[in-house]
Amino acid sequence: MLRRTKRTAAALAITFSAGLALAGVVQAQQKTMSIGTGGTGGVYYPLGGAVANVLSKSLPNVQATAEVTGGSVDNLKLIASGQSEMAFTMADAALDALQGQDKFKSGKVPLQALLVVYPNRMHVVTVEGSGIETMADLKGKRVSTGSPGGATEVMAFRVIEAAGLDKDKDMKRERLGVAESVNAIKDRKIDAFFWVGGIPTAAVTDLAATPGMKMKLIDHSETVEKMNAKYGKLYTASKIKAGAYPGTDKDNAIAEVWNLIVTGDKMSNDDAYAIVKTLVEKKADIVAVHKEAESFSLDNQIQERSPIPFHPGALKYFKEKGIGG
């Protein structure tokens, strides 16, 4: 009886060990994927949530999660540290990271583009009664140039410089995200703010729809030529169309820059291929969350819109679809 009990125990131990080994294999196959996005008042976060949802539903053994962050600069640092596998970023911030410039002087970040996604439009926002009609009128005013972890600050500084202003001497500068900037301008704590994002940005829509306030967008497309001369051909002159936000009755002449979804240098070709293929072919599911995803198109996958190289896995998919990449 004792011998049989020992045999049974041994058999159970073997079965249990085999079960643990099998569980380990299953666990190893499960991939978690952190996606750096932005603040809850912007466009990166809802789009990132939609991207995470599509990838989790469409790719076997993948669990993707959209992370709230400070924006492009924070996202690129998360990529550098290995805390995020993918991230949204503006092209200018990505180039700075790749080259170890500006906010990335502590070290270059190895980056590869997965997808060119949509253009970010610079908003220079104020309200009636602020005395601000042109960029020159920002002199002496209280102005938010974006949060420290976002790329709004990067581009805002360049727009201000190209407009002939000094960001440190010519204005009282705050460093607020878009939602915080909207609250501050409502409370009359600031006179204007910079925000670079998709159309519409929820927080800006909230300001435009606020009773008793008339939001104004300041033209600044004249800064594009000087910015490109100094920083490379990253920016284009564009417009925020009349009606894009409640109460806006004329086009706003602006500077814009393209957004990318990027990864570091660790993602396999197979994973990159599967991710890009899924995002392009499931675009309609993402558009249902935010219309800027309309730009997740093959026509936009050109090197001129991405200053960093495309991942080989992405290029494989583009080539299959007749796009050079």
Q: What does each model-found stretch correspond to?
A:
Residues 51-61, 102, 153-171, 186-189, ...:
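Ligand-binding cleft/hinge of the Venus flytrap
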Residues 80, 88-104, 157, 161-164, ...:
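A ligand-binding cleft/hinge motif common to bilobed small-molecule-binding domains
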Residues 66-77, 166-186, 199-202:
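Short helix-initiation/N-cap motifs at beta->coil->alpha
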Residues 29-147, 217:
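Short, glycine-/small- and polar/acidic-enriched structural segments
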Residues 1-14:
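Bacterial N-terminal signal peptides that target proteins for export
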